[in-house]
Design a protein with these regions (language model features):
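Extracellular repetitive beta-rich solenoid segments
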Residues: 2-45, 113-117, 126, 142-148, ...
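Surface-exposed loop/turn positions
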Residues: 27, 97, 157-159
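Terminal (often C-terminal
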Residues: 41-115, 135, 150, 171-188
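Solvent-exposed serine/threonine-rich low-complexity stretches and specific carbohydrate-binding patches
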Residues: 131-140
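Noncatalytic modules at the cell exterior or secretory-pathway interfaces
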Residues: 153-167
Length: 188
């Protein structure tokens, strides 16, 4: 057998992985264990934020029933997601690969309703609460509180993530800042 180096092969003898000509940029080939495979992105991510402003914070009336928070999210870094404002603030996953995603939401909130109130925040996927991604914070009148939520879900194309809130009594919730991070890895 001849000793041939890849660097000396001419074009007709070069072999590209199956389907490379139609694979999207950044894709990796994942073998399915049956002699075939597919091109997929190894990961997707997004960071959505509400700029810090404690002098004129975002505000929203909330009640004793969960409703979606509706701040205006800007995107910091993004691969595979879209920030939407209708029907309310949400982040939608746009890619065809299934992902296992870790979610992290951090915010500074307060209210001026007088007295202490219990404020609950939860992460939702497609309008349903994510198990374990639900916290409660007792907030005092005009005191800023930092709240963090974490969760993990499987994301499919067009799934969306939202943040919902409710309180022990109706109040106006003010948000000085917020950051939502979604980091997804390919699920074979």
């Amino acid at each position: 057998m001849a000793n041939v180096n890849h660097s000396t092969l001419t074009d007709p003898y070069l072999h590209e992985p199956k389907g490379v000509a139609t694979a999207s940029a950044g894709s990796l080939y994942y073998a399915d264990g049956s002699g075939s495979g597919a091109w997929n992105h190894a990961h997707h991510y997004v960071g959505g934020y509400v700029d810090f402003d404690s002098a004129s914070p975002e505000s929203q009336a909330i009640t004793t029933t969960f409703s979606a928070l509706d701040p205006t999210f800007a995107l910091a870094e993004n691969s595979g997601f879209t920030a939407l404002s209708s029907p309310n603030a949400r982040i939608r996953y746009d890619e065809p690969e299934a992902m296992i995603a870790t979610l992290s939401f951090s915010t500074s909130i307060r209210h001026a309703a007088g007295g202490s109130r219990d404020v609950e925040l939860a992460l939702y996927q497609n309008g349903t609460i994510i198990n374990g991604a639900h916290v409660i914070q007792t907030t005092g009148n005009s005191d800023w509180n930092n709240v963090t939520l974490v969760g993990q879900v499987e994301l499919a194309q067009n799934d969306y993530i939202e943040v919902f809130a409710k309180a022990s009594q109706s109040l106006t919730l003010e948000t000085a800042s917020a950051f939502l991070t979604i980091k997804g890895v390919f699920k074979p």
